[in-house]
């Protein structure tokens, strides 16, 4: 029996250890190590269960041996100063005859668990190797301890070194301007530096850091049929090639599916925020739980940086938690099957640990707009979701005091949260995913015009003289969000794929309306691919803003049960070089702005009161603005290049006479148009007057002095 066995507390630290750790750290003049910090294992301040022996490792001296489960060593006499919060590598010099042991790094006393690493079979008790784990540490003085979940090895020393991190909020070490942080102000997302509203409009990079195989046309298969979830793909590759080769192939996919050209194209299509869905095992070592992977932050860091270089924020979206959070039939959380996150205590604890790691990593990183705690958590009830989400909120807030944290919406809504502000929370937001026209939401509306009008009704609601702001449809959500004074994200929406030729303009209008409410919005999704690709015809477009081109970008399917590792690698590599095409209608409308000398579509107002939009039969198609009642209005930011007289043409229709349209600025009339009886709501005429305008950037408004007419477009031409 070991001499110290009589005074052991199995699996726990002693009260003496806790006292001794505190006493040493508070002693005047006590020396503290700076990084890199190497600590000889035998230099513990106190221990339980271990013994020392001479070592034949390089450098000589002693090693700690006779290590068994529940032993521990505390190093309170060797405190280490961590200069900044972030990632650090911890190396352990170990030897083992059989392997299977494990080391858990903790704060002395066990207050904080930094993760566990497995000790391999090194070939003998004095055959030494160095193993490494990556941990996140907070700035300050640490007194570390080593706990032993499983023994059977010797330990000579351990060493802590800093990892070069791209998560610093400083601009001095990067070649681009840092974005200002975003914070909550009531129901608004605002620039933390000047408190001005930030209109976030972006996309989701789906199928990259968590795969959804329908987004690649469903052309990946195995011997059991089509691959529908990432778990199936990884399982087949692991069984055939081993875990290490599977991991290498997954890295090839991630390196090639999204590249810098994607970020260039996102910026060119008017995006300023990118939601990044990821699977838990991108960060946590699935083979060694409670440990971050050696490459844990590679892809998130890279994406945050590439987005910020182009002036775009990021939202970090845990799309797939360990065990799965979605309903059993869903594949988007990584694995089809029961949502075990809600019933497995270990999975839930690991998810809290994961968010602790993320919060430590990106604390102070201003380019991260928000943390999205869980995507589409349909596998539980709304009350359980709310309670668990508040748990995650507290985990994150303990390590990151400033980032906005998104409380996930349930498929029944957000009411279970109550009002987050009543809990004294700050920088908290909520989200929902709105998919008009899909999955039972008016999905019988006809393709094209029918879908376009259904989307238009959702966006513009109903207004009356006593309630010009409107009720019904999206207005009810706006009123609910304003009532709780909490920012809101429409985390997913799809405004083009069923709308045909109307899709590009409806995409822009959706962003405009959501932003006018103060909401952020990210469409689903950035990219999809298919076997044949697209010839660029925007009247028939899939779910991605971009896709592979039919001109040289077609793809054949692959069976991963029979393809070689080299063939799978080649298939994955094609994504970085295949020709891509973007939806040019979306690109045009996302960059459209009102200008003199060309038609200004009336429905493309920035703000409005009481107006609706609908498809039009006028020449050129598209939409018109209508449902005009007295005192309604529409406003348009526009730059007038030179002062002087301009011809104002307005394209109007009405079954009545006596309507009055006023072009105004700051409430002052610039010109008045009397709208004639054109013979019907879709019988169009052009009315013309002259107006005098000042030069410069300004907001011009079309004011409805007397309603009962539609307007398709208007145009200002310098005389």
Regions found by a protein language model. Give the residues of each.
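Active-site mouth of glycoside hydrolases
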Residues: 179-192, 197-200, 205-404, 409-417
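Bacterial N-terminal signal peptides
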Residues: 14-26
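Extracellular glycoside hydrolase catalytic/binding regions
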Residues: 181-182, 343-519, 539
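N-terminal secretory signal peptides that target proteins for export/translocation
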Residues: 1-10
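Aromatic-rich peripheral "rim/lid" segments of glycoside hydrolase catalytic domains that contact
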Residues: 502-595
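Sec/Tat signal peptide C-region and signal peptidase I cleavage site
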Residues: 27-31
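Glycan-binding loop/region signatures in secreted carbohydrate-active enzymes
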Residues: 204-255, 429-431, 436-476, 481, ...
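Extracytoplasmic
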Residues: 32-166, 172-175, 592-719
């Amino acid at each position: 029996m070991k001499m110290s066995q009589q005074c052991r507390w199995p699996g726990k630290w002693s009260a003496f250890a806790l006292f001794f750790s505190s006493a040493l750290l508070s002693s005047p003049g006590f020396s503290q190590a700076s990084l890199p910090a190497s600590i000889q294992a035998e230099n513990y301040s106190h221990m339980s269960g271990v013994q020392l022996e001479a070592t034949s490792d390089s450098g000589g001296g002693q090693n700690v041996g006779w290590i068994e489960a529940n032993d521990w060593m505390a190093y309170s006499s060797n405190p280490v100063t961590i200069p900044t919060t972030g990632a650090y590598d911890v190396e352990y010099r170990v030897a083992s005859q059989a392997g299977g042991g494990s080391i858990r790094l903790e704060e002395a006393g066990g207050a904080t668990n930094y993760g566990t690493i497995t000790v391999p079979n090194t070939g003998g008790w004095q055959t030494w190797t160095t193993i490494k784990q990556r941990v996140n540490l907070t700035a300050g003085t640490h007194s570390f301890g080593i706990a032993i979940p499983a023994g059977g090895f010797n330990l000579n020393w351990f060493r802590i070194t800093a990892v070069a991190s791209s998560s610093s909020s400083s601009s001095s070490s990067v070649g681009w301007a840092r974005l200002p942080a975003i914070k909550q102000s009531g129901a608004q997302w605002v620039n933390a530096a000047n408190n001005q509203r930030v209109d976030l409009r972006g996309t989701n990079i789906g199928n990259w850091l968590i795969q959804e195989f329908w987004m690649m046309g469903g052309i990946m298969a195995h011997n059991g049929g089509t691959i529908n979830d990432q778990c199936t793909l990884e399982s087949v590759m692991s069984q055939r090639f081993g875990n290490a080769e599977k991991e290498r192939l997954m890295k090839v996919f991630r390196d090639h599916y999204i590249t810098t050209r994607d970020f260039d194209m996102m910026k060119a299509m008017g995006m300023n925020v990118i939601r990044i869905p990821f699977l838990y095992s991108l960060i946590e070592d699935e083979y060694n739980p409670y440990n971050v992977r050696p490459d844990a932050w590679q892809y998130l860091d890279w994406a945050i940086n590439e987005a910020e270089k182009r002036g775009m924020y990021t939202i970090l979206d845990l799309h797939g938690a360990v065990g799965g959070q979605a309903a059993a039939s869903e594949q988007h959380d990584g694995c089809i099957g029961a949502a075990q996150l809600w019933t497995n205590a270990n999975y839930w604890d690991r998810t809290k640990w994961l968010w602790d790691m993320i919060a430590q990593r990106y604390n102070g990183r201003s380019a991260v707009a928000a943390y999205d705690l869980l995507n589409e958590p349909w596998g539980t009830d709304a009350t359980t979701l709310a309670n668990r989400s508040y748990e995650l909120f507290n985990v994150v807030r303990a390590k990151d005091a400033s980032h906005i944290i998104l409380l996930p919406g349930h498929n029944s809504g957000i009411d279970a949260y109550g009002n987050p502000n009543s809990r004294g929370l700050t920088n908290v937001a909520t989200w929902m995913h709105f998919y008009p026209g899909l999955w039972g939401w008016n999905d019988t509306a006809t393709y094209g015009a029918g879908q376009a009008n259904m989307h238009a009704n959702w966006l513009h609601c109903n207004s009356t003289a006593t309630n010009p702001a409107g009720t019904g449809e999206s207005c009810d959500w706006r009123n609910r969000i304003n009532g709780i004074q909490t920012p809101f994200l429409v985390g997913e929406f799809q405004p083009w794929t069923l709308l045909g030729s109307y899709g590009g303009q409806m995409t822009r209008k959706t962003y405009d309306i959501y932003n006018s409410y103060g909401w952020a919005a990210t469409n689903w999704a950035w990219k999809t691919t298919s076997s044949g690709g697209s010839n660029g015809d925007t009247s028939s477009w899939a779910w991605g803003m971009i896709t592979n081109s039919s001109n040289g970008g077609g793809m054949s399917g692959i069976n991963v049960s029979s393809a070689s590792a080299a063939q799978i690698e080649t298939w994955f590599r094609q994504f970085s070089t295949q020709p891509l095409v973007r939806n040019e209608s979306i690109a045009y409308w996302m960059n459209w702005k009102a200008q003199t000398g060309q038609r200004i579509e009336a429905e493309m107002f920035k703000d409005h009161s009481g107006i609706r939009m609908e498809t039009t039969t006028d020449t050129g198609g598209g939409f018109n603005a209508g449902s005009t009642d007295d005192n309604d209005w529409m406003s348009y930011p526009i730059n007038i290049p030179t002062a002087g007289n301009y011809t104002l043409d307005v394209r109007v229709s009405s079954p009545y006479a006596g309507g009055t349209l006023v072009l105004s600025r700051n409430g002052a009339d610039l010109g008045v148009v009397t709208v004639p009886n054109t013979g019907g709501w879709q019988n169009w005429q052009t009315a013309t007057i002259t107006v005098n305008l000042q030069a410069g950037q300004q907001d011009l408004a079309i004011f409805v002095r007397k309603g009962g007419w539609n307007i398709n477009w208007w145009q200002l031409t310098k005389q």
